[in-house]
A protein has these predicted regions:
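Short secondary-structure subsegments characteristic of cysteine-rich extracellular domains
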Residues: 56-72, 184-199, 320-326
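Outer membrane beta-barrel translocator domains of Type V secretion systems
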Residues: 116-297, 402-403, 408-410
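Long, charged/polar, soluble alpha-helical segments
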Residues: 120, 124, 130-131, 305, ...
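Outer membrane beta-barrel transmembrane domains
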Residues: 201, 291, 320-424
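Solvent-exposed flexible segments
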Residues: 285, 297, 302-308
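Extracellular beta-solenoid/beta-roll
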Residues: 1-47, 51-111
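Solvent-exposed, glycine/polar-rich loop segments of beta-barrel outer-membrane systems
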Residues: 10, 122-125, 129-132, 181-187, ...
């Protein structure tokens, strides 16, 4: 069994009790497959393990696999064999009619049944990789849940003398992983620039609107493959900061992602491209309470409503993949606490996250096989981290944020943000 069809093995006599023979077969046709010839007698029960070089077994019925001169035993197929979307249990049968010239018995493929597949597992290598690719696209979009500090630093004016308008730039990176039958492990870097306009300023609050554009570059690992990730995000922001320490940050974002992937399945390399689109509306509220010595605590709450969809695609193996669109709501409750002086601020933080939607459905089809996979990404995870900001001059501040998160199946291995904001 080496992936090459039409190979033969010839034996004089074969005492095959307890033995296993490995054969390659094209499941789409009943001709040209591997063939075993036993010119003399065959005794015992021999297992034939068939490995398909195609996506299904629907076309292989009737293919002759073994020809025997004098049959005194039997051939069976006791082990499952893997095709593109399902494992199959194969049934062999023998005949003495119209057999191969010079032989008395032919063993052929009589029938097959699909092994059961469910949301808990028993998916094929192809199915697990494709499920990881489409699910990983969703997790990539979900991981972009942002905060006001990560985007603008200390936005309350405590480290800036003039905060009317501002230009900001930042870099960020993240690594996340999720354990399931559709394994995904991703990391990326993202670079973003933005501009803020002062909309209104009173004695009690400041109201700023802004726009930002981000470019993402990363990679992902699946069960037996990898993906090259690219992303583009346009964001609109509406931020109100009150003098008493409260703030409300609203965001509207649209993202487009490209995933050029490749994986190994059915003994060969398979590649393709999976694109996806996501839209989100988010609201974040916080209330910084600070004492006269500079110590502060800031409870926060955030919700993000989102719509996500994977584009349909067909990989180089001929498997067509369609993802159903999904709506979700992401929630975060947390706090940061630290110390703030006229020159710098430092803090520690902790957060609780939950995905209240995340019901992701992928439909795969090839030849006559069709598989509908449901994966529940309704994860809960906790994060902790630290950060700080530094006033470089009257209008310029630098800031950073570090975070790590852990959940039952989803882990945020690390996350970092570094930014600069110039106010004028």
């Amino acid at each position: 069994m080496d992936g090459r069809l039409g190979e033969t093995m010839t034996a004089g006599s074969f005492a095959g009790d307890g033995a296993t023979l490995y054969l390659d077969a094209d499941g789409s046709t009943n001709t040209g497959n591997d063939h075993v010839y036993v010119m003399g007698s065959h005794t015992g029960t021999t297992d034939l393990h068939l490995e398909s070089t195609s996506n299904t077994w629907s076309g292989a019925l009737g293919t002759v696999l073994v020809s025997v001169g004098e049959e005194q035993g039997s051939f069976v197929s006791d082990s499952e064999t893997e095709a593109a979307l399902y494992y199959y249990n194969l049934e062999l049968a023998s005949t003495s009619d119209n057999v191969t010239d010079g032989y008395s018995t032919d063993w052929y493929l009589k029938g097959f049944t699909k092994a059961p597949t469910n949301d808990e597992g028993h998916h094929t290598t192809v199915g697990r990789n494709l499920g990881g690719i489409t699910g990983g696209n969703y997790l990539l979009w979900r991981s972009d849940m942002d905060t006001l500090f990560r985007r603008m630093g200390e936005a309350d004016g405590s480290l800036t003398d003039n905060t009317d308008n501002g230009i900001w730039a930042r870099g960020k990176g993240k690594k996340f992983s999720r354990e399931s039958d559709f394994l995904v492990d991703s990391k990326y870097n993202e670079y973003e620039v933005g501009y803020d306009w002062l909309h209104k300023k009173t004695d009690t609050k400041e109201h700023v609107i802004g726009v930002g554009f981000a470019y993402l570059d990363g990679d992902a690992t699946y069960v037996s493959g990898k993906g090259d990730l690219k992303g583009y995000t346009l964001g609109l922001y509406d931020t109100q900061v009150w003098k008493n320490g409260q703030y409300l940050d609203l965001s509207l974002k649209g993202s487009r992602y490209e995933n050029e992937f490749g994986y190994t399945g059915l003994g060969r390399f398979i590649d393709g491209q999976s694109n996806s689109t996501g839209f989100s509306f988010g609201a974040e509220y916080g209330y910084k309470k600070k004492d006269e010595k500079g110590w502060f605590v800031e409870p926060q709450a955030q919700v993000v409503l989102g719509h996500f969809r994977n584009d349909a695609f067909t990989d180089s193996n001929g498997v067509h993949v369609e993802g159903e669109s999904l709506n979700t709501a992401l929630g975060r409750i947390g706090a940061r606490a630290g110390y703030e002086s006229p020159r710098f601020a430092v803090y520690a933080k902790a957060n609780w996250y939950h995905d209240f939607g995340g019901n992701h459905v992928t439909v795969m089809s090839v030849d006559t096989d069709r598989l509908r996979v449901h994966e529940d990404y309704g994860d809960t995870w906790f994060s902790y981290g630290l950060g700080g900001a530094y006033k470089i001059n009257d209008g310029l501040q630098a800031y950073f944020d570090l975070e790590r998160g852990d959940g039952s199946s989803y882990d945020e291995n690390w996350s970092w943000d570094v930014g600069l904001r110039w106010s004028f």
